[in-house]
Amino acid sequence: MNKPFIKICGITNTKDAALATSLNVNSIGFNMYEESARYIPKEKVKEIIRELPENTIPVMVFVDPTFDYVRSCLDISPKIIPQFHGKETQEFCSSFEREYIKAVRVSKKEDLELGSQNYSNAWMILFDSYINKQFGGTGKVFNWNFFKGQNIDKDYL
């Protein structure tokens, strides 16, 4: 049996980051989307990342960002993995020359297969519930029966 990959997102302070890493999570996520209630400025992320254990992967979550904004955020550390939650193309996501996670909003069964096909070079796919005008961490569960009969050849969250 494979060990699950555990990522806690929405970290906004060093205390929460320390708690998450004490629980041996694989990754912690920082929301770089200014419209999010869990938005954190990149300067604060830089402070938190300095304190992370070597084996904890920092992930930065973006929604339809500019190339320059992503680049400036990723320049903080070569360990950072970007996670894209908007309408970014595979070409855009892969233009940063590092692994990335692509969130795919799911409202119907076909979204699962299309998401993994359209982002074939993603490190992982994050399947997220489709909620109109709400991106990432919706707190809503989509119909997991959609996975029945699917052959997804990509790691996913």
Where are each of the predicted segments found?
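Conserved N-terminal beta1-alpha1 strand-loop-helix module at the mouth
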Residues: 1-157
